[in-house]
Amino acid sequence: MSIYDDILKQFPTIDEWSDSDQKIMLEPYTYLGINTAKELPSMVTKALNHWYQVPQPALDIVLQIVGPIHAACLLIDDIQDDSDLRGGNPVAHKVYGVAQTINTATYVCFDAYHKISELRPFLKSPETIDLWSIINDEIAALHRGQWIDLYWRDSLICPTEEEYLRMIHNKTGAIFRLPMRLLQALSPVDSVPDCFPLVNIVGILVQIRNDLLSLSADFTKDKGFCEDFSEGKFSFPIIHSVKADSSNSLLMDILRLRPKDEATKMKALRYMKDQTKSLDHTFDVLCKLEKTAKQELEKLGGNSELSSIFERIHLSPTPEIEDH
């Protein structure tokens, strides 16, 4: 008998999905080799639970939501930035192709979405708390931030520092606000603290820290040498340098070229370091952000886990530039 003779019985509902199919489909995701539990969003989430006291089973589900979404964002970011390396290895889309990597990243996000329903039994008032609106709000914010970042890059429009901070508030802040808001909704504590200001400043701090690190020698082995220039990206220190001397078009000209050679990128980096002092400015801003974050932490009564995280991400004075 041909399969077509009994086609309706062959496919009565949604097709079954085997474990082997799932494993193959997730390969670009698993290739990242990211231990999501050791990534900053997950670490901050666990530290925030010091105040929210969400039961461990519910906390685990929240981590299973934020971890994969963060990893999926990295997969998409690498494609949109046309990156070559992540963690010192070729990026996933250079191994599996752009199409497969996009499909896997999207699937991982939807898989995380499904876990929202598993949190409903932990809600005190499931009829009044909409967990779906929380995840929808923050995923939308993330995409809005990513859009404006790409728009500036592709249109060669240098934003102001204030505009950049607002972009970070959406793009990076969403990854930290999402789990915090879920914990807030799930908390059995009668009076939970307002962690929004702290989490928002953490998102800004983390992004600007990454912007500065991406111009350091230590970052070269993970992502390549000064890849922000090759990507034409307006990072925080680059924005400061462009705005510091509008009469000098050197940096804008280099960003327009999106150079791959180290000599051109080193020329841009030395201009930022020696002429506009943009690396020093970025470090000074980081110090102010750290101070604000620690003050906010004190207002909330302190948190040893978050204090440890702040110590871990603290940067020493501006890293030295090494010749290449």
Swiss-Prot record:
It catalyses: (2E)-geranyl diphosphate = (E)-beta-ocimene + diphosphate; (2E)-geranyl diphosphate + H2O = linalool + diphosphate; (2E,6E)-farnesyl diphosphate = (3E,6E)-alpha-farnesene + diphosphate; (2E,6E,10E)-geranylgeranyl diphosphate = (E,E,E)-alpha-springene + diphosphate. Mg(2+) 1 binds at D77, D81. The keyword Lyase applies. Its EC number is 4.2.3.-, 4.2.3.106, 4.2.3.46. Mg(2+) 2 binds at D77, D81. Binds 2 Mg(2+) ions per subunit. Keywords: Lyase, Magnesium, Metal-binding. GO terms for molecular function: lyase activity; metal ion binding; prenyltransferase activity. InterPro entries: Isoprenoid_synthase_dom_sf, Polyprenyl_synt. Belongs to the FPP/GGPP synthase family. IDS-like terpene synthases originate from a geranylgeranyl diphosphate synthase (GGDPS) progenitor in fungi, after the split of Melampsora from other genera within the class of pucciniomycetes. They lack coupling activity and act as classical terpene synthases. This is IDS-like terpene synthase 1. The lineage of its organism: Eukaryota, Fungi, Dikarya, Basidiomycota, Pucciniomycotina.
